[in-house]
Amino acid sequence: MAMTVHCDIVSAEGEIFSGLVEMVVAHGNLGDLGIAPGHAPLITNLKPGPITLTKQGGDREVFYISGGFLEVQPNMVKVLADTVQRAADLDEAQAQEALKAAENALNAKSSDFDYGAAAARLAEAAAQLRTVQQLRKGK
């Protein structure tokens, strides 16, 4: 039996996952992080994107988070997400539409244009699409 670590994924809406996992892969500010049992303690920001859990037995589960924090302790990994959704529940067509709308907003700047908000919408839509693609790859 493979070594495991307890993982919790929570958001303001509540807990979406709690259980033993063999590996957690998340998208941090400096790139992807792979957390396995015995990983050094750390706290880091998470960018919008997929979180992949490899559960006992090798089954994988993918979630989308809109950002948050990752805390690693010797026997525990905790993801504190702004919002979290199971990747299977994401609507790819809606994410594509949001991506196009964000790109159009960036290209059609008006006098009251908020570049930061438009860039954030673009990044979130792109992260949702990346999550859907990762889910498809894993099947």
Swiss-Prot record:
Q: Give the subcellular location.
A: Cell inner membrane
List UniProt keywords, sorted A-Z: ATP synthesis, Cell inner membrane, Cell membrane, CF(1), Hydrogen ion transport, Ion transport, Membrane, Transport
What InterPro entries is this protein classified in? ATP_F1_dsu/esu_C_sf, ATP_synth_F1_dsu/esu, ATP_synth_F1_dsu/esu_N, ATP_synth_F1_esu_C, ATPsynth_dsu/esu_N
Q: Which CDD domains match?
A: F1-ATPase_delta (cd12152)
Q: Which GO terms describe its cellular component?
A: plasma membrane; proton-transporting ATP synthase complex
Q: Which Pfam families match?
A: ATP-synt_DE, ATP-synt_DE_N
Q: What is its main location?
A: membrane
According to the UniProt entry, its GO molecular function terms are: ATP binding; proton-transporting ATP synthase activity, rotational mechanism
The membrane spanning regions, by residue number, are none
Membrane topology of the entry: Peripheral membrane protein
* Domain of life assignment: Bacteria
Q: How does it assemble?
A: F-type ATPases have 2 components, CF(1) - the catalytic core - and CF(0) - the membrane proton channel. CF(1) has five subunits: alpha(3), beta(3), gamma(1), delta(1), epsilon(1). CF(0) has three main subunits: a, b and c.
**Similarity field:** Belongs to the ATPase epsilon chain family.
Q: What does this protein do?
A: Produces ATP from ADP in the presence of a proton gradient across the membrane.
Q: Tell me the HAMAP family matching this sequence.
A: ATP_synth_epsil_bac
Return the NCBIfam families for the record: ATP_synt_epsi, PRK00571.1-4
This protein is called ATP synthase epsilon chain
Q: Which gene encodes it?
A: atpC
